Amino acid sequence: MSDQFDAKAFLKTVTSQPGVYRMYDAGGTVIYVGKAKDLKKRLSSYFRSNLASRKTEALVAQIQQIDVTVTHTETEALLLEHNYIKLYQPRYNVLLRDDKSYPFIFLSGDTHPRLAMHRGAKHAKGEYFGPFPNGYAVRETLALLQKIFPIRQCENSVYRNRSRPCLQYQIGRCLGPCVEGLVSEEEYAQQVEYVRLFLSGKDDQVLTQLISRMETASQNLEFEEAARIRDQIQAVRRVTEKQFVSNTGDDLDVIGVAFDAGMACVHVLFIRQGKVLGSRSYFPKVPGGTELSEVVETFVGQFYLQGSQMRTLPGEILLDFNLSDKTLLADSLSELAGRKINVQTKPRGDRARYLKLARTNAATALTSKLSQQSTVHQRLTALASVLKLPEVKRMECFDISHTMGEQTVASCVVFDANGPLRAEYRRYNITGIRPGDDYAAMNQVLRRRYGKAIDDSKIPDVILIDGGKGQLAQAKNVFAELDVSWDKNHPLLLGVAKGADRKAGLETLFFEPEGEGFSLPPDSPALHVIQHIRDESHDHAIGGHRKKRAKVKNTSSLETIEGVGPKRRQMLLKYMGGLQGLRNASVEEIAKVPGISQGLAEKIFWSLKH
């Protein structure tokens, strides 16, 4: 396996959805295309110690990059895999020269037609559906058809010599035309017609006919037959899942966008004649502070109005973003193409699902890109370089949360070389300060955290103070006054302040509470780890504050009632299902709680009411 391809890091980013994957060598050539019901499971199998074959070993040894395209159904993945193989001709895929070598599904012309896989010349009388990319795809489809439309798949030699139905009939996978009287000629012919329509991509017609038959059976009080047809309808719907292979012959590009950590991904899904031909993710360079709208508008303009891209303009473009110059863009594209080009940002129905697919792929590709480019270790290495430290093995970050100065909670989160160390996260209830005094709260939590003995392995290399210069000054004062046995000068104190509009990527960092701070580029791995730990600390503080506020809300009303101590409060809330249930209870209901007398129940009742 290539030293440059980090399979472990890549697999952490892969989804378990169905889709298609493309493997590239050092020259950027696609060397293998595959599909999977579960992308994560399938791709993981390539990086086991005991590979299945020498071919797989040779393939894996050349992998430099893997791209994935998520699909909503396995059928989509199959179609997309076929298109990619035809497009790239990867040397590790089985490449067949002409359609004679491709397998087909064969529907025979017998009195009772059968389904089978067929290769080679088409001499036998019947209908051929395909070609399919490989035998596995045909066998998979035949197994599916057998569950929904139970027509026979046995050889004629078996069919002609049966006196009683086989196991396939017993388990509902065949109607048993081999034995007279088990199925009528009309019913069998109807199921064959359903198969014919289904394999022709006309599943809507199949559903329409089945629904009509179900309604007729129901009106005739044939409820058992109606239930059987209902089950068949549900099976067809489950399989088709309203696949993104349009019968209307859509000719369009679908553009999904994802934006995170200063990086944008624009994923374009190419659809021609209603078929998904393929897709590609683009990662435009994004200057710091750029709005997402500018990223999208600039990309779309460059993509279609420059170079040779205009030669492949579709009839319609679906966008995941509402452009301010949508009309101008559409007019420009129409003029270049010499025909009407529509730009749509709020599609409905199937087209909205196309857009959802592009959006999903954009998010997946961006997650993978960010992870591959900046793992936690890489980010910490980058941070150490920025801070001029030999290494950063441990970071701690503090944040304060309160509501109008009440129920103040401070949080401390810890990162080590592998990222968040959640077992060591801590919350501190802040008391004895003036309401809303965040400086005093920060002073208190730092003294409680560091004013004691600390094991050498737990001394942080960096302490991040969320809040800017004022909070950093408090931290500096606390550490100057600490009288501890461990090296209090080892941790580097770093203040971080959000930009004026509090946008991620515009943070200012401070080494000292005086003077100017400095900023890092929005795509800097060092900034990403700072944002990560700061956001973790913020979420941890808010979570603790909400719990504290909820606890106060539930208990404060009871704490003022004489004779109701902690144990009785707990018992009352437990039996009544919370404070609201207790407020709605009668005196008699309250008196039934263990440990609550009639007199105390009346006191509780009137205290809560008044």
From Swiss-Prot:
GO terms for biological process: nucleotide-excision repair; SOS response. Keywords: Cytoplasm, DNA damage, DNA excision, DNA repair, Excision nuclease, SOS response. GO terms for cellular component: cytoplasm; excinuclease repair complex. InterPro entries: GIY-YIG_endonuc (IPR000305), GIY-YIG_endonuc_sf (IPR035901), GIY-YIG_UvrC_Cho (IPR047296), Hlx-hairpin-Hlx_DNA-bd_motif (IPR003583), RuvA_2-like (IPR010994), UVR_dom (IPR001943), UVR_dom_sf (IPR036876), UvrABC_protein_C (IPR050066). Residues 16-94 form the GIY-YIG domain. Interacts with UvrB in an incision complex. The UvrABC repair system catalyzes the recognition and processing of DNA lesions. UvrC both incises the 5' and 3' sides of the lesion. The N-terminal half is responsible for the 3' incision and the C-terminal half is responsible for the 5' incision. This is UvrABC system protein C.
